[in-house]
């Protein structure tokens, strides 16, 4: 799904490059020129020009020369993925509409009506169908992709599968009602899946007559956030009315900052998001990792491992660790190729073949990973949060119990694992898991796999997906 920043960029950029359309209407889909470097050698780009040993910066210039000269790729803003979370009917979708309409009034967004966002298209991630609506908009400093899910189950599935990764969230709480059960569940889920920061919007301020009541709700929200180990004391909380902002902007789409109290609250919220939610570290800056998809031998040259670079960069001559399934070993990269073209280095997002010195084809297999030495280790036991599909979603028809042994699909590997323990949100042991449940489990794999905290996986049984999860804690 094209919401996580690298994917969002690459798919949009790919359209532009392969068709070379002069239409300016396509250009806003590019997230940030600062990230184009990551995409330069992405698989769809290469056939469009011959590339032998160009550096990343040269090829960026070459592939985008014409457009840059016409000012189409001048977007220098960093890209951030955010989403609205919170209890049903507290105003998440109305707020999303208000954000797009307010920023459209200053030319930084395309206004979306409530029903355009609410009729969310279906997406699939790890074999699970999820309804998510994505809108994009800009502030003065940043470009945002914003995800909104219509149903509570869609939030749970989206956050666990990572279909729409969030770099931060806007927690929407009704000022008239205060925090409700799903408010708590979404905060907990955000913590468990690693959403680093959030900003709060106290909605429906117009329905609260007493200012003290609003202060009490704010206090309650701060305490709740602190109880889930967010920085409750410092998180910005902005109160307002998304509905009144939408009504004002519907009557007059050209309302400017300072013209209307409720529209100003929306700008104030985005100022807080700009200031408080940090720009995430991009994939190229992280330690190198490639999950091996295929292996073949080139007579006289050695063994080639192919796959997509998940993060970081790798250059010819560098040493990499081969991790997972067997004992970890180190090898030297003697060549980097993509589509029969030789490269100096591979970047995050590239589909490449790495030529390795001193390794036989039999020593490497699909499911292993090549990584920067020491950056990732193999493990056999971890604790994870999982969502189990309902029967209607194509999942199991019956519950499962401790001792259940499905297949766990992680990156390019599938390995059998045993569910040794089942727990609820309070870490109390449970006896069984029903289809549709979200629970914490402890898994023991039959062979060590390169895994890490925050890594997502699918659970499969008999050829079909029965659940998805994210690793919370590595145990051994």
Curated annotation (Swiss-Prot):
Residues 1-67 form a transit peptide. Gene3D superfamilies: P-loop containing nucleotide triphosphate hydrolases, Translation factors. Residues 127-131 are annotated as: G2. The keyword Protein biosynthesis applies. The modification Phosphothreonine is found at residue 94. It is found in: Plastid, Chloroplast. Keywords: Chloroplast, Elongation factor, GTP-binding, Nucleotide-binding, Phosphoprotein, Plastid, Protein biosynthesis, Transit peptide. GO terms for molecular function: GTP binding; GTPase activity; mRNA binding; translation elongation factor activity. CDD domains: EF_Tu, EFTU_II, EFTU_III. InterPro entries: EF-Tu_GTP-bd, EF-Tu_GTPase, EFTu-like_2, EFTU_2, G_TR_CS, P-loop_NTPase, Small_GTP-bd, T_Tr_GTP-bd_dom. Its main location: plastid. It comes from the Eukaryota. Residues 77-281 form the tr-type G domain. GTP binds at residues 86-93, 148-152, 203-206. Residues 148-151 are annotated as: G3. Belongs to the TRAFAC class translation factor GTPase superfamily. Classic translation factor GTPase family. EF-Tu/EF-1A subfamily. This protein promotes the GTP-dependent binding of aminoacyl-tRNA to the A-site of ribosomes during protein biosynthesis. HAMAP family: EF_Tu_B. NCBIfam families: EF-Tu (TIGR00485), PRK00049.1 (NF000766), PRK12735.1 (NF009372), PRK12736.1 (NF009373), small_GTP (TIGR00231). This is Elongation factor Tu, chloroplastic. It comes from Arabidopsis thaliana.
